[in-house]
Amino acid sequence: MFALTFLGTSASVPSAERNHPALLVEAAGKRILIDCGEGTQRQLLRSGAGFRRLDRILLTHAHLDHVLGIPGLFSTLGLRQSSDVMTIHGGPGTLDIVIRMLAGLWGAGRAPIPVEFAALSEGQVIDAGGFTIDCFPVRHRDTDSFGFVFQSPARRHLLPDRLASLGVPDGPLRGELAQGRPVVIEDGRTIDPEDVLGPATGGRKLVVIGDTETTEGLSQYVADADMLVIEATFLDRDASIARDYGHLTAAEAAAFAAANNVGQLVLTHMSGRYEDEEILAEAARIFPNSRIAADFDHIVV
């Protein structure tokens, strides 16, 4: 299960209702921030999420609307005397920009809190403990952009009727079987896990894509996702402008979701030039299970 809190859902120009991009993903006791636009620290407080156990930031790219909140967040964490190491993941070019930004404020190699930088590469898999994050390249203007696949493992559960019929008693033996190890019961019979485990269920797949100028080549990462979070900065009537600025239209995002058997489509990176109803209508005509994210929306997948 992944719990998402949308902290910022605007395009490059924020509005009174929408902050610069940031998304909090929580799973298996971990809390991961995707992008950190200006004002993200206040959005964390306003959402009720706060700063606790926040130790990893994934950056889609280094355009300023996605990274300017990092210095303010770090300054506040430093004032709170946080000793936790913050790991920032991003493409090499993205990290170079962030490192130079921090150096301009606090000096080379310095920051208010301990920081580690981890460069992303195509095909890299981050083991977050309880789930994985696959990283894949995305095309957006002159940046080294990345998208992310959050995957929780499907699990097989013990079948009570089978345990009872085979005479497996309550206790440690059942725990061994649940871990996939055969056991020998009191009468000498060996019980194999395959005899008492049901089919794998419960795995979840969440895909988050930030700014992107095309969905070409991305189907292999998005196919069969339970949820796709992706930008929809323009309407289809302005597709030529979308190309000029390296963004998608709502229709393109919806067609991409429909072609890849996505469960739910969540659109973000909203431009103030359109009404939400226009954007949603364009997407829903193609992919009915679409919604537009608003700041402080909380969605569980």
Curated annotation (Swiss-Prot):
The active site is at D65 (proton acceptor). Homodimer. Belongs to the RNase Z family. One of its GO terms (molecular function) is 3'-tRNA processing endoribonuclease activity. Keywords: Endonuclease, Hydrolase, Metal-binding, Nuclease, tRNA processing, Zinc. NCBIfam families: PRK00055.1-3, RNase_Z. This is Ribonuclease Z. InterPro entries: Metallo-B-lactamas, RibonucZ/Hydroxyglut_hydro, RNase_Z/BN. Zn(2+) 2 binds at D65, H66, D211, H269. It is an enzyme of class 3 (hydrolase). It comes from Bradyrhizobium diazoefficiens (strain JCM 10833 / BCRC 13528 / IAM 13628 / NBRC 14792 / USDA 110). SMART domains: Lactamase_B. Zn(2+) 1 binds at H61, H63, H140, D211. Its EC number is 3.1.26.11.
